[in-house]
Amino acid sequence: MAAKLKKGDRVVVLAGKDKGKQGEITAVMPKDNKAVVEGVNVAIRHTKQTPTAQGGRLAKAMPIDLSNLALLDANGKATRVGFRFEGEKKVRYAKTTGDVI
């Protein structure tokens, strides 16, 4: 099955503690049905100091389920993603506007 959301897409969170937040997808895990979104679902990682690296509390974006994300169209509104053929090529398009993504 083709991926509706890909790395680099601008998305909005639909549910959970980060509902309404927007960000860019930095990684997608299709087998787990999850994605990592910049600045969303952030956890604090405590690291021990080493001779080469300073320790402390580092913020790390954790994976979020794809069902809780929606793509942002050109107008900045949440949209569903569809597929269609343009010539010989299969393309993704925003269902709200019909524009090719």
UniProtKB/Swiss-Prot annotation:
Q: Its quaternary structure?
A: Part of the 50S ribosomal subunit.
User: One GO cellular component from the entry?
Assistant: ribonucleoprotein complex
Main function: One of two assembly initiator proteins, it binds directly to the 5'-end of the 23S rRNA, where it nucleates assembly of the 50S subunit.
The UniProt entry, under InterPro entries, shows: KOW, Rib_uL2_dom2, Ribosomal_uL24, Ribosomal_uL24_CS, Ribosomal_uL24_KOW, Translation_prot_SH3-like_sf
So what family is this one in?
Belongs to the universal ribosomal protein uL24 family.
One of the GO biological process terms? translation
Determine if Ribonucleoprotein is one of this entry's keywords.
yes
Top-rank taxon: Bacteria
Q: Which HAMAP family does the record associate with it?
A: Ribosomal_uL24_B (MF_01326_B)
What are the entry keywords?
Answer: Ribonucleoprotein, Ribosomal protein, RNA-binding, rRNA-binding
Q: Which GO terms describe its molecular function?
A: rRNA binding; structural constituent of ribosome
Which CDD domains does this one have? KOW_RPL26
Q: What is this protein called?
A: Large ribosomal subunit protein uL24
